[in-house]
Amino acid sequence: MEEFIMNRDLKKIISQMTLEEKAGMCSGLDFWHLKSVERLGIPEVMVSDGPHGLRKQDDKGDHLGMNDSIKAVCFPPAALSACSFDRELMESMGETIGREAQANDVSVVLGPAVNIKRSPLCGRNFEYYSEDPYLAGEIAAAFINGVQSQHVGTSIKHFAANNQEYHRMSNSSEADERTLREIYFPAFETAVKKAQPYTFMCSYNQINGTFASENKWLLTDVLRNDWGFEGYVMSDWGAVNDRVKGLEAGLDLEMPGSNGTNDALIMEAVKNGTLKEEVLDQAVERILNIIYKYADHRAPKEFTMEKDHEEARRIAEESMVLLKNADQILPLKASEKVAFVGGFAKKPRFQGGGSSHINCFKITNALEAVPADAQVIYAEGFPADKDLYDEKLAAEALQAAKVADKVVIFAGLPDSFESEGYDRSHMRLPDCQNRLIAKILEVQPNTVIVLHNGSPVEMPWINNVKGILEAYLGGQAGGAAVANILYGIVNPSGKLAETIPVKLADNPSYLNFGGGDKVEYREGVFVGYRYYDTKQMEVAYPFGYGLSYTTFTYSNLQISNTNPTEKDTITVSVDVTNTGSIAGKEIVQLYVKDMTASTTRPEKELKGFEKVQLAPGETKTVTMELDKRSFAWYNTELHDWYAASGKYEILIGASSRDIRLSETIELSNSQVIPMHIHMNTTLGELFNNPNTKEAAKELTSRYLAAMNGGSDTASQSAAEAITEEMVAAMTDSMPLRSLCSFGGFSRTEIQEMIDKLQAIYSNPLK
């Protein structure tokens, strides 16, 4: 079959198509289907949401989940599944969704969504993986490989810098290239290089004043030329601003169709010569290639939704994060009388609203999933769908709390608090929930909170409750996963894929999120833990954090090469031991810290992780690899990644704030950074460039001699007044032109030195 694809002559097929057929191939037939050309054997194919389960609509189509879709399995949304830090698990989830797509005649699944969690307020954060681009990219690549192993395509989205819902169809994300390359692009880049998704979905927004749908730099220069993407680019639904400009920029497919309006504009542009027909042909070829890649591999397999439901439960169990377990209040014992309080115990919130909303065939709640011999009483406590303090419900909950040994409060955000289409205005739980939690704590200190939310919430009761389980949105089997973790049937192993700040104002984007036609990303590369850890700020819970019912120790950190060059790959290994009494899984995290940074960089950055399962007393060696990119930052002068020579610390930890082992390496890089030397170039800049460092030393020496009246020694009083540190600081920021005033140089001499230095830079001595 693969050979048949390779022998298919797409260019010949395209040559037989009319201009109208080619233009039509570049837009959808309707909300979900691509057009067919029956006379040439081009089939009609369907695409469908979504990132955590199929939202296939047979009748009325829409992109916001307003109309019904077929019954399907809702897997845990990305906000939860990313907390698994488990590539194999995510690949398995992808395979399962891919099988369901094959069986339902869906050619492309519209996901995963890998936009970075810039702010907790983004209404669509439940659908996104992480604040960290490395984690998001690794998880996304695994998911994509899983789906596409079933010969069903994916459409990674939303490319790019789509990090809020407010005015998402028109606002401009204003970010410098380094920020885009280091934070908002890498998850997409990793997906291309490790999984080659069949399709990309461009975002609604503008990037620095140009719509993503017509941004040639984004869709062609970066995506295709830099990264090597081979598939087709489709628009988000209704994202096209100028169809002809979009086609020229690299937008192949408009979704949904525009009732022929934009097809006519394409044909007119070809006829009047403003659009080259080869550009149209190239787009058609990309689309046909993916259509046939699916059509030639039609292999529907039987699947049972019940089995996939159990897979959804397993993913949720592997991902939920135990945040607090004071006095080992968890796991619960069947012999204990436990009060479950809160509507989410009976009717869980397990997915978000909008295009990814699944019509579940089955939903499991925690109340019905507890062990058969468990002693559980239930009180609703507060309505789960609105912020309303009900005195009668509260009184019932308080009475249950008084007679119980322990209380588990199922708190969280109602559907109306977060959804696609709008952002939150605050990080608070509904007031009615916080009020009831406070009252219950007055009568029952043995209280555990289970959170159902798509994005972090403030926790005013954090120091008073004994346990917190972050369940996020758990998918349709999330209730069973919660019950199994609470009762110790499953040992929690998830870790936070995002930082939980103490309060909203602590977030780095706080002053620059939301309103206006332009959103300025002034925090630059300091997103999430990159900001909090660099600032050494107090957080509620740090990135990568999560507890287990067992304990782990780390030892024997080994690094294969402590003096690498930028061309080397380094192997890092560490032993992890389960020092507790039950089996468990630990997520080992590797961070890199630039100790001699020549530019402003975060305190540390995640560059590796592995999840390892260990029996009690068992030790395993975890191995990870680092390459040039692991140490590099994006240099806009080089237009490339640059790993500067110097010392780097390899940090092994259980979270970004819990570093267990570290070792320093020294990297050497022969890569030359372009440098234009002029009158305002500083001595510090010359010192920091290996090609001009020696010349800078000579200039500084002459400058200091002139300052000392031609002598290398200063008077005692001067020596006391001017320290070496002062001189170093002054010379570091001194422009070359200042040598006229302070160094006894003429303007002509300085220009001659500049010419000499530029020559040294251009032809460095080997």
Locations of the language-model features?
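Generic structural signal of hydrophobic/aromatic residues within well-ordered alpha-helices
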Residues: 10-13, 266, 496, 726, ...
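Low-complexity, Pro/Ser/Thr- and charge-rich linker/hinge segments at domain boundaries
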Residues: 668-688
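Terminal connector regions
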Residues: 627-671
